[in-house]
């Protein structure tokens, strides 16, 4: 029953809805021209009225216009009555409406101006919000800064503290501060304040570097050197090779300052002090270097792309440079002249080289050529001066008979001091002052040479002496040519005796002196040959008497055995076995007389030349 009752109601509602749709369509068709469809659809009363009309009968429809007219007239009359009764209200309403209209215009204008100003106001608000946020952020930062005031102050005072540590030599604390600043830089490198602190700390580190290197330029001991190099390594500004170079440069500057301060007026004093300072301080520097740096091969090979540096070559090159500089100074001072101290100077230099052998820098082998050059140069200079003095004496010499000469008829009998094995000068030279002075000067040169007389100079010394004797021979011949025409028979005999003494006494005596300086056995042992074969190597250690005799042969008397005895006397000495070294080397005694003044024949006693 319930279901049967529900179905008709649904059908009725559907039929009503369909009816309304049809009415609306019909009304739309009828009043298309009078009422737009949108208008009556929007006004419910119009639609309701039209639907009411559509449901009225014909009679009502006929009376409807009249009713509407009457209702209209009635409404108009009511409106008039209302207007008449309330005209003041309408007037006030109109005035109010007009005023409101004006006010609305003002409001509209104000709103327009407001709308025009709103964008700038909006931007100002944004700026205000931004500034407020910045102020708030700054306030927070200021609050945080105030809370961290102590920590910030400590950071800001790092440059001042770093400078104080460096200037007061608190290098350990300075390195800790530098490490802390490097960590700050890695974390906060974008902060300008941190960058400023880093720059100031770098300046202090540069000052610290200068101070440390300056300490190496002073008389610093090994413990202090170790500390300084440790600081430099921790600063990490040099590679290992650069650090070695810096160390050697600084220590070399200190050593050069010491050597430069030595007075240079006296060559012997200068070179002795130079040897002492170089030996002591160079040894200290080498000891310091070896204690600080290791020349062992690295445990790890160098990384790819890295240049391999031979660090040990740095040190050895520096040592070679120092040795070369010392040898240059030594040779310079030796050539300037050191008097008779060549032997003591050689001993000091040898001790210097021996001390360096403990550090692998023995340079004694380089000393021999230096002393040889100086010794032969000094000897050659002395020989040259001797020849020049002989030339001066011969220019003013006059042949005057002397008792020693005139009282003897046999010349060899008057020469008892020229027997083999003796070093006493021939006394017969006293009768001829130029020859005596010449021999004296030669013996002085020999005595100076004896202090430092290496076997290697045998040939050079012999050659220099032969050249000097050859020049003396030429001087004698020049004297003969100049004076021969004015010679008397006595003067001619004296001149012959002069030449005979020169060749038979002076030259053989010089040969014996050469054999004392350069023993033939020692020369043969040095050459590694028997003494009997020494003559095959030329005139080593003896003068060629025949070469000197030849220019004077036309003056001398015809005697075939003039030099036979002397050559036989020299022969055993050249071939004798090497003697045992004496406790003290025999000394070459010069001839007694001094050179005469004004060419007088009288001779005066002269003290013998004494070697140092």
Curated annotation (Swiss-Prot):
Residues 568-612 are annotated as: Disordered. It is a peripheral membrane protein. This is Conserved oligomeric Golgi complex subunit 8. The keyword Protein transport applies. It holds the Pfam family Dor1. Its main location: Golgi. It is linked to Congenital disorder of glycosylation 2H: CDGs are a family of severe inherited diseases caused by a defect in protein N-glycosylation. They are characterized by under-glycosylated serum proteins. These multisystem disorders present with a wide variety of clinical features, such as disorders of the nervous system development, psychomotor retardation, dysmorphic features, hypotonia, coagulation disorders, and immunodeficiency. The broad spectrum of features reflects the critical role of N-glycoproteins during embryonic development, differentiation, and maintenance of cell functions. Required for normal Golgi function. GO terms for cellular component: Golgi apparatus; Golgi membrane; Golgi transport complex; membrane; trans-Golgi network membrane. InterPro entries: COG8 (IPR007255), COG8_Metazoal_Plant (IPR016632), Cullin_repeat-like_dom_sf (IPR016159). The gene is COG8. Component of the conserved oligomeric Golgi complex which is composed of eight different subunits and is required for normal Golgi morphology and localization. Keywords: Congenital disorder of glycosylation, Golgi apparatus, Membrane, Protein transport, Transport. One of its GO terms (biological process) is retrograde transport, vesicle recycling within Golgi. Belongs to the COG8 family. It is found in: Golgi apparatus membrane. It comes from Homo sapiens.
């Amino acid at each position: 029953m319930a279901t049967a009752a529900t179905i008709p109601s649904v059908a009725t509602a559907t039929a009503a809805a369909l009816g309304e749709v049809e009415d609306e369509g019909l009304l739309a068709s009828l009043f298309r021209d009078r009422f737009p469809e949108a208008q009556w659809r929007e006004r419910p009363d119009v639609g309701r009225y039209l639907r009411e009309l559509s449901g009225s009968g014909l009679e009502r429809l006929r009376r409807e216009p009249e009713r509407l007219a009457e209702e209209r007239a009635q409404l108009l009359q009511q409106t008039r009555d209302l207007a008449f009764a309330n005209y003041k209200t309408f007037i006030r309403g109109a005035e109010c409406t007009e005023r409101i209209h004006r006010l609305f215009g003002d409001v509209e204008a104000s709103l327009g101006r407001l709308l025009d100003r709103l964008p700038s106001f909006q931007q100002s608000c944004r700026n205000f919000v931004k500034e407020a946020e910045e102020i708030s952020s700054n306030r927070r930062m200021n609050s945080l800064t105030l809370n961290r005031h102590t920590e910030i102050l400590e950071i800001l005072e790092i440059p001042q503290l770093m400078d104080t540590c460096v200037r007061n030599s608190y290098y350990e604390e300075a390195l800790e501060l530098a490490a802390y600043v490097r960590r700050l830089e890695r974390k906060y490198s974008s902060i300008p304040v941190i960058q400023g602190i880093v720059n100031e700390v770098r300046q202090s580190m540069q000052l610290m570097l200068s101070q440390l290197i300056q300490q190496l330029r002073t008389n610093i001991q090994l413990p202090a050197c170790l500390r300084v190099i440790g600081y430099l390594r921790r600063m990490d500004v040099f590679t290992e090779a650069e650090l070695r170079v810096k160390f050697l440069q600084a220590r070399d500057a200190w050593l050069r300052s010491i050597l430069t301060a030595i007075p240079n007026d006296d060559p012997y004093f200068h070179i002795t002090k130079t040897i002492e300072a170089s030996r002591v301080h160079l040894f200290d520097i080498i000891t310091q270097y070896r204690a600080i740096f290791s020349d062992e091969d690295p445990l790890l090979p160098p990384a790819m792309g890295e240049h391999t540096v031979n660090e040990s070559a740095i040190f050895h090159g520096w040592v070679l440079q120092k040795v070369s500089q010392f040898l240059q100074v030594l040779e310079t001072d030796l050539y300037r002249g050191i008097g008779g101290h060549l032997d003591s100077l050689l001993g000091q230099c040898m001790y210097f080289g021996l001390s360096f052998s403990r550090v692998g820098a023995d340079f004694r082998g380089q000393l021999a050529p230096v002393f040889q050059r100086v010794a032969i140069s000094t000897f050659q200079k002395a020989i040259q001066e001797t020849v020049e003095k002989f030339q001066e004496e011969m220019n003013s010499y006059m042949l005057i008979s002397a008792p020693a000469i005139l009282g003897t008829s046999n010349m060899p009998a008057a020469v008892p001091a020229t027997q083999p094995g003796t070093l006493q000068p021939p006394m017969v030279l006293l009768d001829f002052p130029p020859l005596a002075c010449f021999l004296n000067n030669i013996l002085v040169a020999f005595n100076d040479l004896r202090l430092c007389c290496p076997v290697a100079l045998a040939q050079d010394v012999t050659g220099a002496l032969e050249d000097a004797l050859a020049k003396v021979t030429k001087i004698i011949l020049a004297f003969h040519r100049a004076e021969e025409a004015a010679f008397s028979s006595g003067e001619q005999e004296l001149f012959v005796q002069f030449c005979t003494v020169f060749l038979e006494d002076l030259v053989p005596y010089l040969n014996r002196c050469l054999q004392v300086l350069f023993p033939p056995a020692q020369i043969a042992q040095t050459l590694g040959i028997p003494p009997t074969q020494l003559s095959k190597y030329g005139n080593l250690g003896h003068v060629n008497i025949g070469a000197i005799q030849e220019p004077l042969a036309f003056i001398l008397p015809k005697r075939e055995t003039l030099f036979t005895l002397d050559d036989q006397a020299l022969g055993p000495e050249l071939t004798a076995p090497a003697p045992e070294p004496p406790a003290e080397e025999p000394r070459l005694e010069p001839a007694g007389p001094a050179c005469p003044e004004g060419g007088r024949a009288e001779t005066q006693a002269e003290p013998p030349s004494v070697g140092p």
